């Protein structure tokens, strides 16, 4: 059976793209299968989305229309392809059939199917190229600021104006020159480096220099100027100096205050009492304690002893050890201490001097070996001591058979001796040996 005329004319004539007609079999000398005739494509199940293409590749109409290319495609994954080869007339123009569907994975050929009728022709559709960004591993995508205009509109940085900084430095130099004499040094404020304002447009006008704005932007506000207080302080120092001079002048011109001050000084100096020393004076076996100032002469000590011994002060002799003391000396000049003892001796009256009171009596103490044998006897100065001996023997119960001896300063006494002869005075002690 011969081939049809429409197939014979297209077996050896390639199309404009260099591809063969649908009836031509490019695989070899084998004869192409006889087409059964124009048969309609089966109705597809519905529009199915095209799977993601591997790349933009153009569809080939000749290969898509070839019947031998469409054979054996019934076992496709989508299940929408016909089981027999489709015949498409080369004289009819292709129309839109429906969504583009991949014939097989990895194949660049597509066709569209219409849902309205199964008689619609298969049409080649060029897929739309999708712009995709491919990032290699290890690369970081460039960040794009979405709200750049918002940030620039809200961000207000101080302008890069050197005039404002010059004005601030001049202001500080002027204030520093005014306060050179003051001792208080104002704290140094740290100035921030000038920053630039970031804007999209190049025609933005720079803001005028604003000193107050720079001050408010600092972390700690600078202290208020204290120039008036310092001026007042200098005036106050002048006033204090004048007051001091007036006080000095008043002190010079007011003698009353000076006299009062001197009197107060005298009172303070004389208020402390003079130191005193207790001087020990020994007369016979008796010890006298007399208070004497350190600057008083020993004459006062002699007068005190004369009053206690009922004798004249001229008859008092003071001895320190074996040395006779001058009555004009003082305890301070002699460096006397509490441990020193001064001996007192009563001198006999000079010859030819009559006693003023011959009947004067004195008290003499008589002491035996026992402590209980103690007796005080009143005798006259010119009276013999025999009466004293008799009173003592009678008081102690001693008879004439007992041998009794009386001694005064190691000297044995006799009955005819008198107190005046022996220099006896009141409170002198006579020892008794029985």
Curated annotation (Swiss-Prot):
Compartments where located: Nucleus; Cytoplasm
Disulphide connectivity of cysteines: none
Chain spans, region Disordered: 1-63, 176-237
Domain of life: Eukaryota
Compositionally biased tracts (Pro residues): 28-59
Keyword match ATP-binding: no
KW Nucleus (keyword) present: yes
Ranges annotated as biased composition (Basic residues): 228-237
Its biological purpose: Regulates the magnitude of NFAT-driven transcription of a specific subset of cytokine genes.
Name of the protein: NFATC2-interacting protein
Organism listed in the record: Xenopus tropicalis
């Amino acid at each position: 059976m011969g081939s049809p005329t429409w197939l014979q004319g297209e077996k050896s004539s390639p199309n404009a793209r260099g591809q063969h007609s649908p009836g031509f079999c490019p695989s070899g000398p084998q004869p192409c299968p006889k087409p059964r005739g124009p048969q309609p494509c089966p109705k597809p199940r519905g529009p199915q989305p095209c799977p993601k293409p591997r790349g933009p590749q153009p569809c080939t109409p000749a290969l898509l229309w070839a019947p031998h290319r469409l054979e054996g495609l019934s076992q496709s994954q989508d299940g929408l392809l016909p089981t027999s080869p489709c015949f498409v007339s080369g004289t009819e123009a292709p129309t839109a059939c429906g969504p583009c569907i991949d014939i097989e994975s990895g194949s660049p050929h597509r066709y569209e199917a219409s849902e309205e009728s199964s008689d619609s022709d298969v049409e080649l559709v060029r897929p739309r190229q999708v712009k995709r960004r491919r990032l290699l591993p290890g690369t970081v995508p460039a960040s794009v600021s979405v709200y750049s205009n918002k940030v620039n509109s809200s961000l207000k940085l101080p302008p890069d104006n050197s005039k404002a900084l010059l004005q601030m430095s001049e202001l500080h130099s002027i204030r520093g020159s005014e306060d050179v004499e003051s001792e208080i040094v104002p704290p140094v404020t740290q100035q921030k480096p000038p920053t630039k304002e970031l804007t999209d447009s190049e025609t933005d006008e720079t803001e005028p220099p604003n000193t107050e704005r720079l001050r408010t932007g600092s972390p700690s506000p600078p202290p208020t100027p204290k120039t008036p207080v310092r001026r007042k302080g200098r005036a106050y120092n002048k006033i204090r100096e004048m007051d001091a001079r007036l006080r000095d002048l008043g002190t010079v011109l007011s003698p009353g205050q000076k006299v009062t001050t001197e009197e107060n000084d005298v009172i303070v100096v004389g208020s402390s009492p003079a130191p005193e020393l207790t001087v020990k004076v020994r007369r016979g076996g008796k010890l006298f304690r007399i208070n004497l100032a350190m600057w008083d002469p020993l004459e006062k000590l002699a007068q005190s002893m004369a009053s206690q011994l009922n004798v004249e002060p001229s008859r008092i002799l003071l001895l320190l050890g074996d040395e006779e003391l001058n009555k004009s000396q003082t305890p301070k000049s002699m460096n006397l201490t509490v441990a020193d003892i001064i001996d007192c001796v009563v001198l006999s009256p000079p010859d030819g001097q009559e006693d003023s009171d011959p009947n004067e009596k004195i008290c003499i103490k008589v002491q035996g070996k026992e402590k209980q044998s103690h007796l005080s006897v009143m005798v006259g100065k010119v009276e013999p001591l025999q009466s004293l001996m008799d009173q003592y023997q009678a008081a102690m119960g001693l008879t004439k058979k007992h041998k009794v001896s009386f001694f005064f300063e190691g000297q044995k006494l006799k009955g005819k001796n008198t107190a005046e002869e022996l220099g006896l005075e009141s409170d002198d002690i006579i020892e008794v040996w029985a």
